């Protein structure tokens, strides 16, 4: 299954208990996939989704959080549409649901951005809004030069609101228009991982990061094949291995590592091909080669000790056979 499908499936099965979060997720899904129709003078709400599990989740939340019944229609593949599509439709009391979810304002006019209770809500509401937006119209590409997490939005106002929600989650996202379609894009690999973690797609993050690391190792191996100097090959391979160990060390220690050691480790992660001397120059304030090496060494030692105490894999467990070749 492609990464987009993996993430959507995991998010659609995620258990969310807080009513405000469920409300924010439903409101965003309806805003990004829904259509308001007047049928016989009454408002009917339709939301088209690409998986059955997402449709069942939406229908369940509409009933449990808002108290409205809905029906699910299955649209068979046709034209460019390869798979089934699932339409969740609310016919009875559609106007009431539209007001509850913020799709229309007090005067009955459609809301163009995200509903007020989502925009003005807490961090958990921002997370839920992004989760709903991704379930509705999100995509995740494979790790590589053009990797991205992207959401197609119903308009520029909704796109800007989603960028604002990402900012509250401390994730950098950009709104852009491509061929008349508004999109919000997260491109940086670390930002993509952070966003997926925020949304609750923990298994998907692990799978995506594994593919990302494999690609980096392969790319490094390809560069190494062109190196004439054996010392340069060993140094580059050691840098990649050190980066993998540092990543694992930061996961083990979480918030318990001293800030100056964390800073040294993050420098190594950000500049995996840099020499120790170059890393020292990038530090603030600049450090000597021995000083930066010592900090990284202490970070790894502290993490390995913590791993031994907890009985979990240490930093060397993150190394792959490609990294161990002399």
Swiss-Prot record:
Pfam families: HTH_WhiA, LAGLIDADG_WhiA, WhiA_N. Keywords: Cell cycle, Cell division, DNA-binding. InterPro entries: Homing_endonucl (IPR027434), Sporu_reg_WhiA_N_dom (IPR018478), Sporulation_regulator_WhiA (IPR003802), Sporulation_regulator_WhiA_C (IPR023054), WhiA_LAGLIDADG_dom (IPR039518). It comes from the Bacteria. Belongs to the WhiA family. HAMAP family: HTH_type_WhiA. This is Probable cell division protein WhiA. It comes from Thermobifida fusca (strain YX).
